[in-house]
């Protein structure tokens, strides 16, 4: 047993240096707090243990929001991606989502270097095994080597490491992701402090050798010609991109899986943890959708300096020899060489309703949770929570008001509100359908929504803020110009409109009104707009969206105004729900457990009815009129 010694004093200690831990540590340090980040292995900083991608549907929104607030994820992927695509372009702008294929090692190395060079930040390869708490307030952490680091706040960003258990068919052993060590001691410390834990499960597919793949039997998927960056600070990225490939399962794949389903830990009871609904294993897909003739499988490179390829959509915990047989049924993989075996991993996570909207634990002052510890899944969800936890831990130490994003502010607000208000019984994944105001929460306007907030907090630099103000002014000035510029029904203009399958003008209208026609866009009208200033492409895209969706946007703004009325009705911190006459027993229990900060949050708690909300509103009126 190690002899304890004084490791030093810090303002904030971050436990874990994955995507949540990196954002938390950088936010804290950049806000001037003396910060320590602890990781089991320095080489696992910003590790991508599963898919080699950043972004995707709804997740791309999160990355843009992290960037708009002054986080690092967007800039890091812009510097290290090997393919970029905008998804859902056939649909409306609310669901357009950027997705980039990462060079995994480059992504890690760059993020590690950013942390190493950051002022106010120290990094240690060390395992935290215990939290020190006095009188309900965190005072430090204890490590396996005996170091005691005193601090004012701790951010837990432990990923899937807490009591991690790897499962492959009949084989199981204690382990973290990607062959790393688990963290087996910290869970007990949390239990001793009264924190409620439960077991979740996730998994990752096999990795294969590129030399053994016949790409001629697959469908090639290229990146976009016009590369759109994640970060609002990145400009005009030109880069040679790699291809990804698409193949499909077939009857033979299904037969092998069905013949061996009894050896699947998911189906024979070996796995106790709850897995992600929206990222099922291939055996789960086959059994849950027996009538589906085939499933898409994506073959994606893991980087430029490796031949490893990721088999997306083929996550499994079946025995290794079964996995090899399954892989060889896929067109193009008949002679495949498996380099890494697919596995499932079980791990401890918390019930996130134990957290405040700031991500601080309700019953342990100065202790924050972020990422998969909180029951979420995904790099982007983790990064978003880490950023907010880092900001709020720093603001609390500075005795400033916390940053709480609402559901009408950001996808980050939806994510955190869902976790701390509703909780989750499975790994939570962000989706556009979870956001009520998604037309307002587009990925293209994240800076308009959040950069002012990031600037006020102190995380957005002057350079970024000046760039944002210039972009904002460009859009506002151009919209005003279009509203005041008339288009006359001249012959040449009507001929131009007819060429674009648009109706002739019967009377003079403004360019703004003309642009509201669905068949026209801002870039089309350049030919008849000689006064147009030279503006960046992203400004033109904003003009298109703001003109064409003006009515829908206004409608959602009105909905948000109603939503905010309830969000502004704050509930007293010391409220005793048992004393409020008229509340149902279930509502009293749920409200006492969640302890919502506002009537708005109370309305979203499962088990709290509209009648209960009416009782609360009457109570509040009497409370504030005393």
Swiss-Prot record:
SMART domains: GIDA_assoc_3. Homodimer. Heterotetramer of two MnmE and two MnmG subunits. HAMAP family: MnmG_GidA (MF_00129). Belongs to the MnmG family. GO terms for molecular function: flavin adenine dinucleotide binding. FAD binds at residues 16-21. The gene is mnmG. Its cofactor is FAD. NAD(+) binds at residues 275-289. The keyword Lyase does not apply. NCBIfam families: mnmG_gidA (TIGR00136). Keywords: Cytoplasm, FAD, Flavoprotein, NAD, tRNA processing. The keyword Flavoprotein applies. It is found in: Cytoplasm. This is tRNA uridine 5-carboxymethylaminomethyl modification enzyme MnmG. Pfam families: GIDA, GIDA_C_1st, SAM_GIDA_C. PROSITE patterns: GIDA_1, GIDA_2. PANTHER family: GLUCOSE INHIBITED DIVISION PROTEIN A, PROTEIN MTO1 HOMOLOG, MITOCHONDRIAL. It comes from the Bacteria. GO terms for cellular component: cytosol. GO terms for biological process: tRNA methylation; tRNA wobble uridine modification. NAD-binding protein involved in the addition of a carboxymethylaminomethyl (cmnm) group at the wobble position (U34) of certain tRNAs, forming tRNA-cmnm(5)s(2)U34. InterPro entries: FAD/NAD-bd_sf, GIDA_C_N, MnmG, MnmG-rel, MnmG-rel_CS, MnmG_C, MnmG_C_subdom, MnmG_C_subdom_sf.
């Amino acid at each position: 047993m190690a002899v304890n010694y004084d490791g030093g004093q810090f303002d904030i200690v971050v436990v874990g240096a994955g995507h949540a831990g990196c954002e938390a540590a950088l936010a804290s340090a950049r806000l001037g707090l003396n910060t320590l980040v602890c990781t089991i292995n320095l080489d696992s900083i910003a590790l991508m243990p599963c898919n080699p991608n950043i972004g995707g549907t709804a997740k791309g929104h999160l990355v843009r929001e992290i960037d708009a607030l002054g986080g690092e994820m967007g800039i890091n992927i812009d510097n290290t991606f090997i393919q970029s695509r905008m998804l859902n372009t056939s649909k409306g702008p609310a669901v357009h989502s950027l997705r980039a294929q990462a060079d995994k090692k480059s992504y890690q190395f760059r993020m590690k270097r950013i942390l190493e060079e950051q002022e106010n930040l120290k990094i240690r390869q060390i395992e935290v095994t215990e939290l020190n708490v006095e009188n309900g307030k965190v005072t430090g952490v204890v490590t396996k080597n005996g170091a005691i680091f005193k601090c004012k706040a701790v951010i837990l960003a432990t990923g899937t490491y807490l009591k991690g258990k790897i499962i492959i068919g009949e084989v199981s052993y204690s382990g973290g992701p990607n062959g790393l060590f688990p963290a087996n001691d910290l869970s007990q410390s949390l239990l001793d402090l009264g924190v409620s834990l439960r077991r979740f499960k996730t998994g990752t597919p096999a990795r294969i050798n590129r030399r053994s793949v016949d790409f001629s039997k697959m469908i090639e998927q290229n990146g976009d010609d016009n590369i759109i960056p994640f970060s609002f600070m990145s400009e005009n990225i030109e880069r040679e991109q790699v291809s990804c490939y698409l193949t499909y399962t077939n009857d033979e794949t299904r037969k092998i899986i069905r013949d061996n389903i009894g050896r699947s830990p998911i189906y024979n009871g070996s796995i106790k943890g709850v897995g992600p609904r929206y990222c099922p294993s291939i055996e789960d897909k086959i059994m849950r959708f027996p009538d589906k003739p085939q499933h898409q499988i994506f073959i994606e490179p893991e980087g430029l300096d490796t031949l490893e390829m990721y088999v997306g959509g083929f996550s499994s915990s079946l025995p290794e020899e079964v996995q090899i047989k399954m892989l060889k049924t896929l067109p193009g993989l008949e002679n495949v060489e498996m380099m890494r075996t697919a596995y499932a991993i079980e791990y401890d996570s918390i019930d996130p309703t134990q957290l405040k909207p700031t991500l601080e634990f309700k019953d342990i002052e100065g202790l924050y949770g972020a990422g998969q510890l909180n029951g979420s899944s995904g790099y982007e969800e983790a990064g978003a929570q880490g950023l907010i936890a880092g900001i709020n831990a720093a603001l609390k130490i500075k005795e400033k008001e916390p940053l709480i994003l609402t559901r009408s502010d950001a996808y980050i607000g939806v994510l955190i509100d869902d976790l701390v208000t509703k909780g989750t019984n499975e790994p939570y994944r962000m989706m556009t359908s979870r956001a009520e105001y998604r037309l307002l929460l587009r990925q293209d306007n994240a800076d308009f929504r959040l950069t002012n907030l990031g600037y006020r907090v102190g995380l957005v630099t002057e350079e970024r803020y000046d760039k944002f103000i210039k972009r904002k002014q460009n859009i506002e000035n151009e919209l005003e110009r279009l509203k005041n510029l008339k288009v006359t029904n001249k012959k040449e203009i009507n001929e131009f409109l007819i060429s674009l399958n648009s109706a002739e003008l019967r009377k003079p209208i403004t360019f703004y009104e003309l642009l509201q026609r669905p068949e026209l866009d801002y870039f089309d009208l350049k030919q008849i707009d000689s006064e147009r200033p030279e503006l960046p492409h992203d400004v033109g895209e904003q003009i298109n969206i703001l003109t064409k969706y003006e009515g829908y946007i206004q409608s959602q703004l009105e909905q948000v105004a109603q939503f905010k009325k309830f969000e502004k009705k704050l509930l007293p911190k010391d409220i005793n729900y048992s004393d409020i006459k008229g509340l149902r027993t279930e509502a009293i229990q749920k409200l006492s457990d969640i302890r919502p900060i506002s009537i708005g949050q109370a309305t979203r708690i499962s088990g709290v009815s509209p009648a209960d909300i009416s009782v609360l509103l009457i109570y509040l009126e009497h409370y504030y009129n005393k």
